[in-house]
UniProtKB/Swiss-Prot annotation:
The lineage of its organism: Eukaryota, Viridiplantae, Streptophyta, Embryophyta, Tracheophyta. Substrate binds at residues 113, 163, 167, 285, 317, 369. This is Ribulose bisphosphate carboxylase large chain. HAMAP family: RuBisCO_L_type1. It comes from the Eukaryota. It comes from Cunninghamia lanceolata (China fir). Its cofactor is Mg(2+). The modification N6-carboxylysine is found at residue 191.
Amino acid sequence: VGFKAGVKDYRLTYYTPEYQTKDTDILAAFRVTPQPGVPPEEAGXAVAAESSTGTWTTVWTDGLTSLDRYKGRCYDIEPVPGEETQFIAYVAYPLDLFEEGSVTNMFTSIVGNVFGFKALRALRLEDLRIPPAYSKTFQGPPHGIQVERDKLNKYGRPLLGCTIKPKLGLSAKNYGRAVYECLRGGLDFTKDDENVNSQPFMRWRDRFCFCAEALYKAQAETGEIKGHYLNATAGTSEEMMKRAVFARELGVPIVMHDYLTGGFTSNTSLAHYCRDNGLLLHIHRAMHAVIDRQRNHGIHFRVLAKALRMSGGDHIHAGTVVGKLEGEREVTLGFVDLLRDDFIEKDRSRGIYFTQDWVSMPGVLPVASGGIHVWHMPALTEIFGDDSVLQFGGGTLGHPWGNAPGAVANRVALEACVQARNEGRDLAREGNEVIREATKWSPELAAACEVWKEIKFEFD
């Protein structure tokens, strides 16, 4: 009688290879690198314990609850091919451990404490399976892909964007001028850089006003709906909401948020506001590489992408496969599908550890940006398909003739690639030829092709 005090082996309680996972469990795949001498079963069980009900010693209050009902369970361990010291530990968490509709709580539970654990040399969360029973407690993206196309009246092609550069230092009026020139030239969107908030050289309200003026002028002249991602990110959630409200009063179609630096709680509040008030929400992933770049420690971006779809956002940056920032093709396409599709089959070659069923949650448009230019257009059109936003910052504003011709060059290149694809041509093989043909009737594109013909972002 009573309880047996003392330190216990985690694997005795939390390593349960016979466990059959339930449809309502949240499943996690962790890449575990145990300290030398720690068996994988003990390390896997330690992860399950520390990210659910466990603590380092037996406590008498364990007797006041049903551990079997609430504990996380490490139900499978497999070696990582080519890595002697690493294992994939699969952990199942009962749904009752999590607050409904809170990405914040989900992450605090699953990754909050366990990453500093002494028995582990390194730990990486590779994937999460979110059951419909949990995902249904989230609103998800404010509008989603189809509603966005209907709002913008743009179909059958990727959308084109451009980040205004230099990202810091322009006055609000000059900033608005650059926005106007890009939109007038043929882009669908322009974008505040992620670190443009409200600095001494350009306060947020001035920027919002000049950008709204720019996009209305461009709309009137082109007959197309235009948008500028007004960055509402701020030092407090209240200030962020104030900026979003002002954007809505200006009648603009879209605002923006840095969801990792701003935090999931703020992001979810903003997403709810955006749905209630007809604003689209563009999400930038500033700070993601701090979390996801190491191969053996941190959180893979596909998990951050899933979390964003639950928290809410209509666009999110997803790497390029071809530009200046890292991204392996198959893995990138894996999380692009996780953002856009309703149902994604388990496929380890693309890094997808679990079959994910989003049921009817709206999709998110992946945004390709970072060091891309007109010569990349065929590859981007083929890799990302129609449901994407292609963002050329330097690839627009770096045009030798100026911003508007830079925008024209990108729009012509995109239309040429979409037309070629619709005619059944193979963009992977004939892409350069398609662009060259298009230069014949677009001097702007010809000039862009000349400037960027030699650029490569490859570091061997």
